Amino acid sequence: AIVLTSSAGAGNQWYKDGAPIGGATATTLNITTLPGNSGSYTVISTVSGCASLVSVATSVTINPLPLVTPIVTPATTTVCNGSTVTVNVAGSQAGINYELFNGGTSLSSTTAGTGGAINLVTSALTANTTITVRATNPVTSCSVLLTGTSVVTVNPIPVTPTINPVGPVVVCEGTAAIVLTSSAGAGNQWYKDG
């Protein structure tokens, strides 16, 4: 809340945009930070039936936050170490910038909202990551995290396998079958000529 304080110890009446605020007669005025409470605030002190002049006005501007409701996908995904992830923000706001974060660390450049869906691409990920999306109004600097997140599991890259026997292998036609063995115990895919 924003707290305005009157120099008068008693008899205060607070005003917003020239209209008295009901029940606002204390030395301090607490203003909740909602955009509808933006305005010009003044105070008059009345003691023994005598009213002071109107105070100098204090202007209060409360800028709205970007919407937190655009949908973030994928909710979960799995990638290999060193890969990037493309995060889709559906229903972005025009005039709002979006950026991916992991905690306080930025994972992407900013992308301007269009009023529709936008894609943001992370930097290379090397560990399990919970991606959040920060929406920022570049004019007011007001920002908020979207409610949706993207949880990324990052799997390690296997060690490059070796082949036994080491080539080149040269035999005559009709020779018994050649058996090549991979050092990797699982997950093999063999290729010929590339």
List where the protein language model places each region:
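Surface-exposed, flexible coil segments in extracellular/virion-facing regions
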Residues: 15-33, 104-120, 179, 191-194
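A short beta-strand segment in extracellular, disulfide-stabilized domains
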Residues: 1-8, 83-91, 170, 174-184
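Interdomain boundary/hinge segments at the C-termini of tandem beta-sandwich modules
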Residues: 58-64, 150-156
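Short, exposed coil/turn segments at beta-strand boundaries within extracellular/luminal domains
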Residues: 48-55, 80, 138-147, 172
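Solvent-exposed loop segments of extracellular immunoglobulin-like
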Residues: 6-16, 93-102, 182-192
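Proline-enriched interdomain boundary motifs that mark the N-terminal boundary
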Residues: 65-75, 157-168
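Surface-exposed, short loops/turns at beta-strand junctions within beta-sandwich domains
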Residues: 33-38, 122-128
